[in-house]
Amino acid sequence: MGNNLEATKNKYSISQMTIAFVVLTVVYILRGKILFFLGPSFLNSGNGKLLQAIVSLVIALICAHFANKFAGKSFKVFIKRIEQGKVRWLTALFCVIVFILYLAKASQWVQVMHKSVMSIITILLLAVAAGLCEEFLFRDLLFNLFTKILSKRRYVLLWSAILSSICFGLAHFVNLARQDFVVTFQQVIAVTAIGLMLCTIRILTNNMWLNVIMHIAFDISPLVVTGDIIGKWSAIIVSGLWIGGISLLTIWVYNHHCLKENLK
């Protein structure tokens, strides 16, 4: 299957892609520190949060551009997309579970719409910034990096999804700078599962834009601004097992299907 992977055609070496990922991730993480000279009193005000959101979006766009450049300037996983065939039934089940997950998010979207105009704009800007940059960093550049490294392995898609999603989850430990360990650890677990879901979407669609849109939609929440706790451990574990489990199963079955198709 390696010959059909877009990442194997990338002119950048593994070391160049790795350095690019590390540098761009650090820049993205530190984006909130750029306006430190304005002082906490202003930055915690409505205008301050809006300004930070605008700066975050600008930096996110720049990082996303360079991430895609080092990923090979392509949104594809496969050079030629392999049809799902009999795997469609599992894809349908995956879509149902994702729909239920987003249906549960609807209450947060309603909460956002009841906030002030400035707060709504701030939340939307932050969601777009995160959706764009994090997808192009983790589901484009890092995923492609792992597919290039593991291109000779049979289950390259599965391992690339697992490793990039674990990195995506671990990256959220930077939030320890502003919140306690329990909240952060909950985020790491939840985000790792969401990362698997987004990898599944990218693999099945052979594109980037649907998972960018879904990431943005997932981040449209009042919690983006307030930083409140995610929820109870039971809810985190159950939802993580459901979405992470169905994502892993879908990728594994599709990866196996791709191997069989390549032998024909």
Predicted regions and their residues:
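N-terminal, membrane-interfacial amphipathic/helix-forming hydrophobic leader that caps
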Residues: 1-76, 220-223, 227-264
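Juxtamembrane helix-loop-helix connectors linking adjacent transmembrane helices
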Residues: 9-15, 39-51, 68-137, 143-149, ...
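Aromatic-anchored segments of alpha-helical transmembrane domains
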Residues: 24-33, 97-105, 165-174, 216-226
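Hydrophobic cores of alpha-helical transmembrane segments in multi-pass inner/ER membrane proteins
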Residues: 56-67, 94-97, 126-140, 196, ...
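Active-site His/Glu-centered metal-binding helix of metallohydrolases
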Residues: 132-137, 141-142, 146, 170, ...
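Membrane-interface helix/loop boundary segments of multi-pass membrane proteins
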Residues: 136-163, 203-207
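Interfacial helix-loop-helix junctions of multi-pass membrane proteins
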Residues: 173-189
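Functionally important transmembrane alpha-helices
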Residues: 184-240
